[in-house]
């Protein structure tokens, strides 16, 4: 009986606990520059989606500014972003738009492999 009561208590405790109790460090990388109209909308929707799911998070946003740089420079910049995220001990990197996605896959940084 004692074990059964303990099992019921632990089950109730686990069911009642949010699965998202951990605070996640999330990096969001945009292809375009800060101030780009679409970036603001995406940032708001991204944050709203996380909050709607009751996910506790800390967000850092990076802007690749792909129209300003050539591919080699973009890959270097995004590799530096990855190093910064690693130092910050980020849990997740979300990449938005084609150019940032290509650059992060091509940069060769071991943190994003």
Residue locations for each model-derived region?
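Bacterial N-terminal signal peptides
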Residues: 8-16
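Short hydrophobic alpha-helices and adjacent helix-cap/hinge residues
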Residues: 2-4, 19-113
């Amino acid at each position: 009986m004692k074990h059964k009561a303990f099992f019921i208590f632990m089950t109730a405790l686990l069911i009642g606990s949010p699965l998202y109790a951990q605070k996640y460090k999330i990096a969001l990388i945009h292809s375009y520059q800060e101030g780009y109209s679409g970036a603001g909308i995406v940032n708001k929707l991204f944050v709203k989606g996380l909050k709607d799911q009751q996910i506790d998070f800390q967000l850092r946003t990076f802007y690749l500014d792909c129209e300003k740089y050539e591919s080699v420079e973009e890959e270097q910049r995004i590799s530096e972003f990855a190093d910064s995220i690693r130092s910050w001990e980020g849990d997740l990197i979300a990449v938005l738009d084609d150019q940032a996605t290509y650059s992060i896959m091509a940069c060769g940084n071991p943190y994003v492999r």
